[in-house]
């Protein structure tokens, strides 16, 4: 970015260690949604999304391990992109879960999203997971003609959403894609697999995070607390140095990594991940992309928000986007409408290295809705 003349103005708020979906666990306090400051930005990269939505910057960087770029993009009315695993170097990023982590970013419109990826993508010898594949000219090749495109609607997500306003906004976009020549059809994944996405994500992510952050012991890295001996120093440091959400995730991760639990918890989750990816691959043999609302509703309230954690809306509709982290394929969110003066988002996911197709569909949606470069007036 610096090489291409970008000017950096600061760092954005984010959830602690990028673990969270609310941006309410940041050391500096809650991030507030610029469209309604009583509501969340989403997380973990919510601060970056809010800055683009406020018009402070045209582009901001984030990271996406489960949906940490794409969900805040939906809540803040901006474009959020998670490219293919390995498309952007992760050098310099503090890891959360290495097999799921992606560098992502936010922009105000699809064309800027194309240009940004052209700059950020490419091989980096400092990151062995970065790809040698040539970087495409996404912006020059941008084509919003939908004739010949075959798109699948994830019906499991639609069925899990309770708010009719969200469904209406989504299907209004679907009809516009059909009018442009796209074939858009309902597609059902195995319901048990869809319900397995969230627990599979939490097991893999928490186990990998526990390993990645084991050096934050107050001795080598991190906040140091006093203690009578080495064990007490480490215990106090890792207890007082992290918020309750992080401590809970580390406990879950440690449990999954116990020798006696690895096969039945961690490795089993990896096997389930593979089955989910195989189901996605089967879908992509028939379709160019899969789409669904990025969330069941507008951004939740910061106070008084209640979540039915066992509902299909929470288990499936609010957490299905981790599928793209499992597969490593490109996925992005674009604005699709408004409710109560707050934005709603639509997610597009494609097979690995099909960023151009993803951008083309996003551009068609943007042209039909007219929702681009949206800037909230913060009150």
Task: Set out the residue ranges of the language-model regions.
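Charged, often glycine-rich, active-site loop that binds/positions anionic groups
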Residues: 29, 196-212
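Glycine-rich phosphate/pyrophosphate-binding loop
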Residues: 224-248
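Short, surface-exposed loop/helix-turn segments at secondary-structure junctions
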Residues: 129-133, 201, 226-230, 263-268, ...
